[in-house]
Amino acid sequence: MTMITDSLAVVLQRRDWENPGVTQLNRLAAHPPFASWRNSEEARTDRPSQQLRSLNGEWQFVWFPAPEAVPESWLECDLPDADTVVVPSNWQMHGYDAPIYTNVTYPITVNPPFVPAENPTGCYSLTFNIDECWLQEGQTRIIFDGVNSAFHLWCNGRWVGYGQDSRLPSEFDLSAFLRAGKNRLAVMVLRWSDGSYLEDQDMWRMSGIFRDVSLLHKPTTQISDFHVATRFNDDFSRAVLEAEVQMYGELRDELRVTVSLWQGETQVASGTAPFGGEIIDERGGYADRVTLRLNVENPALWSAEIPNIYRAVVELHTADGTLIEAEACDVGFREVRIENGLLLLNGKPLLIRGVNRHEHHPLHGQVMDEQTMVQDILLMKQNNFNAVRCSHYPNHPLWYTLCDRYGLYVVDEANIETHGMVPMNRLTDDPRWLPAMSERVTRMVLRDRNHPSVIIWSLGNESGHGANHDALYRWIKSVDPSRPVQYEGGGADTTATDIICPMYARVDEDQPFPAVPKWSIKKWLSLPGELRPLILCEYAHAMGNSLGGFAKYWQAFRQYPRLQGGFVWDWVDQSLIKYDENGNPWSAYGGDFGDTPNDRQFCMNGLVFADRTPHPALTEAKHQQQFFQFRLSGRTIEVTSEYLFRHSDNELLHWTVALDGKPLASGEVPLDVAPQGKQVIELPELPQPESAGQLWLTVHVVQPNATAWSEAGHISAWQQWRLAENLSVTLPTASHAIPHLTTSEMDFCIELGNKRWQFNRQSGFLSQMWIGDEKQLLTPLRDQFTRAPLDNDIGVSEATRIDPNAWVERWKAAGHYQAEAALLQCTADTLADAVLITTAHAWQHQGKTLFISRKTYRIDGSGQMAITVDVEVASDTPHPARIGLTCQLAQVAERVNWLGLGPQENYPDRLTAACFDRWDLPLSDMYTPYVFPSENGLRCGTRELNYGPHQWRGDFQFNISRYSQQQLMETSHRHLLHAEEGTWLNIDGFHMGIGGDDSWSPSVSAEFQLSAGRYHYQLVWCQK
C-alpha cells in the first residue's frame, strides 16, 4: 500500500526538479559498469551475466502536459488510456510532444532553477516478475543508463528515489521494495528540470527513457567499486597493473580479493590480498579497500593504432576460494602525459585526427544501438580518424568498450553546457550550482576511468569559466592524475585546462573578441609563458557543402609540433525522419515540428548524412589525415609513415602513370615502413607518351587483407603528381566545309551540315542549337555570377535576423541575384574558314553596372564552337560566387563522362583528395543531396566533359544536374526538389571557395575569393 511519504502529492510539493541542491535522492554511488558474474571464466570472456537482466522492451506510457496532471492512482495501476512504447526511446519520436532544435537559446524561459508550469511529463510503467532466488538474498538494483531530464521512481506503489543528469546512470536499490510474483515499476519523467539549465547543448531537445534499463543482482557482500591503472618504467618494457578494489557489506577477516590479468587465454599475472587499504593520513587507511599491484614484463601496449586489450578479472571470495562474485574490465597498457608542451601517448607525441560526435539516429532520435555505434567507429577508422570527442556529454556505456577494442582515442566530456546564459558563467561561477556540476563531473570519471580509450577528461562545453570549473579541475587531477583535463570555456587557455583547446580558431587570422580573443593557432603557441599543447576542440565546421581550407590546418599541424590536431565539427547530420501524407519519409530539421525557438538547419553539420552516407567532404578529411605522406623526386618516391607504433605489415603501394586517364604503366611494391620511418621506392623508367595530354603519376596505399575495421582492398592513402610532358603542338585539322551565316532582323543563324546555331540579336545570347531537327537548348547560354547559397554563404542570416557581412546578404544587397543583361554589342563576321560572333553585355542592377562580359564564339568547318570570355568585375561590388556560363540542355542522358578532378564533388579550396582521371558516373551521382539544398556537385580542373551528344573541352569547372540554381536557392528541403525538364549545366571559368573554418562568419580565404577584377577563360563546345 502506498504510504503518505510515497504519494505523488508529496513529490509534487517538494519539486526536486527545481532545486539545484538536489541532484538525486537515494541514488547509489557511481562506479564502472557491473555484471556481478558468479563464474570467473564468464567474467574473463565477457559472457552475458545471469545476474544482469534487461528491462528493455514494451512499457505502458501516458503523456501529460504537466506533472500536476498525473493522477495519484497511476502509482498503483496502469491508466485505461495508456499506450505502449518501446524503451529505450524518446517519446517525441512516438508522436508525443515535439522535439525542439535550438543551439544557444534555451528552449524555456531562463529563470534558473525554475522551469515552466507546462512541463511535459511521461509516465512509464512496467510489470515484471522477479526471480525467487533474488528475493532470498543479496541486493537487487535497477539501473537507468539515461533518462532525460529528471525522474521519480516508484516500485509497487512505494517511492524509491529521484535522479537527474540525463547522460549518466541513475541506479537504485530495489531490494526493500520487491515482492514475490509480479512487481510494478512506475517512472515519472519530466521534460524540464533545473538540470536542463546545464544541458544547453547544440542538439535536439528530447525526452524520455532513452538508454537501457536493467536489473542487477549483487550479493550482500559485494564489490562496490574497482579502478585499474597502468604504470611503466622509462622504456615501457616493464609495467605494473595497479588495481584498487572497494567492497560493501560485512567486513570479515576471511574475505579476499584476487585480481588476475589475462591476454586472451593466457593468464599474465595474478595477485590476492585481504582488505585493508594503505595508510592515507594520521588516522590510517580505508578498511574496505585494497590495492593490488601486478608486474607485467614486456606488455603489449594499447594505442588507437594497435588496440592491444588485456582482461582484468576481480574476484571477491573467501579464504578457502569460494567465489562470492566477480567483476571484470578490459585493460589497455598505455600512458598519457604532457611533457615539454606535447601530449604524449606511450612516450610519442600524438597527432589528433579527431571528430566531434553527437549520439543521433534519424529514426530513433538519441537512442543508440550497437550496430550504429560500430558503424560509426568503422567509418571513422576507414577515413583515418583516430580520436572522437563525446560532444557534449558522456556517451552510452558500450561506446567506450567499442573504442577500447577497435582503437579510438576518446575525450570524455561532462554533461555541462550553459551556452544560453548571460553571462555564460552565470551558473558555473555560482556555488549553489557546484553540487550539480560536481555530480556530472565526478560520476563521469568514476564510471569511465577504467577505459584505456579515454585519454582526456573534459569539464563540459561552452559554459564560460567559473570557480566551479577550477574546483572540479583540481578534483580530477587529485583522483586521476593519469589523464590531462581540457576545457574550452573562458577562452580555451584558462587555469582549468591542461591543453589549449579553442574552437574555430583560424590558422593565421586573429579574432580579437572582447574578453575571450581567439588568436590564430600559430600565434597562440608563442604567447608569453604559454607552454601547453594546442588541440582544437572544434574546427572545420562541416555544415552542408563545407570543409574548404581544411588542408591549411593540416599543413600547420604537420609544421608545428605543439599544434597537435583537433576535432572536426561534427560527425553526423542531426536530421530526423518525418513522413508526408503519402507515407514517404523525408529529412526534417529545426522548425519542421513546429518547434520554437529553433535554429533551422544548423543541426546538420556532419561529415556524414544522418543515415551515415558520407558527405563528399569526408574524403577530403580522409586524405588530409592519412598516415602515409609522399614526396616525389625524379623517379623516386619517398614514403613517410606517421604511425607512431604500427609497422606497415598490410600495405601495398600501387602506382600508375596515365595520360589523360589512359594507363601507360603501373606497378606494385610492398610497404615495409617502421613507425615514423621512411621507405624509398625507385620506379622503373617511365614511358614517354607520343601524343599530347596530361601525364599523371598516382599512388595508392592498399590493404590487401581485411582488418577489424576494413575490408580487403581498403585504400588508406593516395597522392598524385603531374609529370612533365613532351612539348606537343596539335595542328588543326583542315576542313573543306565552311559554316554558312544567315542574318535576319532577330537572329544570326549559322549552319554546317545537320547542325545549326542561333544567336538572338536582341539578347546577344546563344538561344538555340539543332542537331538535325532536334533542339538542344531549353534556355539560352548566359553568364552566371551567383550560386545557390551555401550554409557558409548564409551565416547566421535568417528572415528575422540579417547578418550584413554574410556573403549572401552582400550579394543580394549589390544586386547579383537580380542583375539583368544590357546588350552592348552583337555582331557576326564570316572568316575564311569560320563564322565569328562577338557579343558584349553589361550586367546591371538598378542602373549600376556590376559585370561586363565580352565573348566571342568561333564556329569552324569541323563544327566546333570555340568560346572566349573576358569578364570585368566592378571594383565596388562584392567578389562574385562564380564567373561562368549556364544553360538548360534539352537532353537527359544517363551518364556523365569527364576528364578532370573527381570522382567526388570538389571545390577550389577542397580538392586535395580529388584525382585527375577520366571519370564516368550516372547523372544522379553528380548531385549531392544536402538536406538543405544549395550549390553542389562541382568538379574542378576539367579538361573534357561529355554528356549526351555534346562535348566541352578547355580548363573549367562544372556541375550538371536536373536542378537549377534558382530551384536550389528557393527550396527549403531536398525532398521538395523536383527534377526539371532537361539538364542544367553550369560551366565556370572561376568559382569562389566554399570556406568552412566556421559557418557564421565569412571564412573563404583570400586566395580563394574572386578578387582579381578581370577574368579570362575559354572552352570548345562540339558534338561527338
UniProtKB/Swiss-Prot annotation:
Active-site residues annotated for this sequence: E462 (proton donor), E538 (nucleophile)
Binding site for substrate: N103, D202, E462, E538, Y539, A540, H541, N605, W1000
Cofactor(s) required for function per UniProt: Mg(2+); Na(+)
Protein known as: Beta-galactosidase
GO cellular component labels: beta-galactosidase complex
PROSITE patterns given in the database record: GLYCOSYL_HYDROL_F2_1 (PS00719), GLYCOSYL_HYDROL_F2_2 (PS00608)
GO biological process, one term: lactose catabolic process
Binding-site list for Na(+): D202, F602, N605
Main enzyme class: hydrolase
The UniProt record lists the keyword Metal-binding: yes
Manner of cofactor binding, per the entry note: Binds 2 magnesium ions per monomer. Binds 1 sodium ion per monomer.
Species for this entry: Escherichia coli O127:H6 (strain E2348/69 / EPEC)
Site residues (Transition state stabilizer), renumbered to this chain: H358, H392
UniProt: Mg(2+) 2 binding residues: N598
Residues the record lists as binding Mg(2+) 1: E417, H419, E462
